Amino acid sequence: MDLISHQPNKNPNSSTQLTPPSSSRYENQKRRDWNTFCQYLRNHRPPLSLPSCSGAHVLEFLRYLDQFGKTKVHHQNCAFFGLPNPPAPCPCPLRQAWGSLDALIGRLRAAYEENGGPPEANPFGSRAVRLFLREVRDFQAKARGVSYEKKRKRVNRQKPQTQPPLQLQQQQQQPQQGQSMMANYSGATV
């Protein structure tokens, strides 16, 4: 969709403002996340610079954000551990959901490189962060009784054809001599 008309304005009395298209929701969220992380680094004791930031600092940041979560994650000793829909309230803490953390790390990983960080030194892509996210995902799945297992791709097991598929397809499409094009149509009679 084009937000700016390319046709000249024929009315000399009207004034039109050309406004650049606004950033996407993703870009805005990425900018907010990046600013939050940079502020976290500034407020860290001792303050951290971006080049000295490691995967361990990213994990500290994720644990800090956990206190603002809105997803109930049951303790292992909670009576509702493993139940997807608990019947009553419990004192278990609210945490950041795994999906939110995963999306946050993806946005911060992109923002790090956009702000001049070298891809090979990206702390958001470190092994420690990937392992942490996997552990959070697995624990939350158990605590909530939800499975995050990957769905396996279906393998199409057909009998091997003696002719290459292209040649077979071409033969099926060409009508036999004296046969109409409608002969291959189911329900047609010749």
Curated annotation (Swiss-Prot):
GO MF annotations in UniProt: DNA binding
Motif (Nuclear localization signal): 150-154
Keywords (A to Z) from UniProt: Developmental protein, DNA-binding, Nucleus, Transcription, Transcription regulation
Compartments, record wording: Nucleus
Primary subcellular site in the record, as a coarse category: nucleus
Domain ALOG: 25-152
Protein family (similarity comment): Belongs to the plant homeotic and developmental regulators ALOG protein family.
Name the record gives this protein: Protein LIGHT-DEPENDENT SHORT HYPOCOTYLS 1
Source organism: Arabidopsis thaliana
